[in-house]
Design a protein with these regions (language model features):
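Generic protein-terminus/edge-of-domain signal
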Residues: 1-63, 70, 76-78, 94, ...
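A generic fold-level signal
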Residues: 11-13, 34, 58, 80-82, ...
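Short, locally clustered residues in the helix-turn-helix/winged-helix DNA-binding domain
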Residues: 43, 156, 190-194
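Amphipathic alpha-helical segments enriched in hydrophobic/aromatic residues interleaved with Lys/Arg
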Residues: 102-150, 154, 187
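N-terminal positioning helix adjacent to the helix-turn-helix/winged-helix DNA-binding module
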Residues: 118, 174-185
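Linker/hinge segments immediately adjacent to helix-turn-helix/homeobox DNA-binding domains
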Residues: 152-170
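Basic/polar phosphate-binding segments, predominantly the helix-turn-helix DNA-binding elements
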Residues: 184, 188-212
Length: 212
């Protein structure tokens, strides 16, 4: 039977290793690699990451996917402004057609520029994982593993939906105009829920006609 839009359980059943959250104000001392897959979500601030032979500028909402054996180093940037980083370590990931602990990278770019709904979902997963670690309740490992797997699945779904469009300096998940506008309108409702909202006001803020 042909495999179509399906991730088999034996492929996406990684071992959860760790999560770590910290604020970086100095360069990471070592240019290094791991024998596991590492995710780094930028929760706030701006900085730089050296991944392979390329230095990427990173900002809030970016998700870095560092495959096994890839050398990398977190850099604070010229102004050394604080960068809040959230790391997740996984191993035993075996996706079809890829090496062990390798995740597909559109255009071979390890930096995913997330925004809108995807960014909100990733942020919530990071917060849920952090809360689970602090609670130390029964089944903590499996809860944290589930959250990490959701992060990977969200990326796979976005790659499938958007056809892997590119943006300079990273992989953008901005899709068709309609989806983009829906996300912007949703953001507007969340920011102004306590105010009186009219169609004219929404259209004015979105630079749209009320007919559209």
């Amino acid at each position: 039977m042909e495999r179509e839009n399906t991730v088999f359980a034996e492929e996406l059943n990684p071992t959860f290793l760790f999560m770590w959250k910290g604020t970086r104000v100095e360069d990471e001392p070592n240019y290094h690699c791991h024998e596991h897959l590492e995710l780094c979500y930028i929760q706030s601030g701006t900085g730089k990451h050296r991944i392979g032979d390329t230095i990427y500028e990173v900002k809030e909402g970016d998700l870095l996917v560092i495959n096994e054996g890839v050398y990398h180093q977190s850099l604070a940037g010229e102004h050394k402004t604080p960068v809040a980083e959230f790391y997740v370590g996984l191993t035993d990931l075996n996706l079809a057609g890829l090496g062990r602990n390798h995740f597909p990278l559109p255009g071979n770019c390890p930096v995913f520029r997330t925004e809108g709904e995807l960014q909100r979902k990733l942020s919530k997963l990071c917060m849920a994982m952090e809360a689970e670690q602090e609670l130390c309740r029964i089944g903590r490992y499996y809860m944290m593993k589930t959250y990490a797997m959701q992060m990977l699945l969200l990326l796979l779904r976005e790659e499938e939906e958007t056809g892997k469009p590119q943006k300079a300096g990273g992989c953008s998940f901005e899709s068709a105009n309609r989806k983009y506008l829906v996300e912007k309108i949703t953001d507007y409702f969340e920011d102004h829920y306590a105010e009186k909202i009219s169609l004219d006001r929404i259209a004015g803020n979105m630079y749209l006609s009320t007919f559209y």
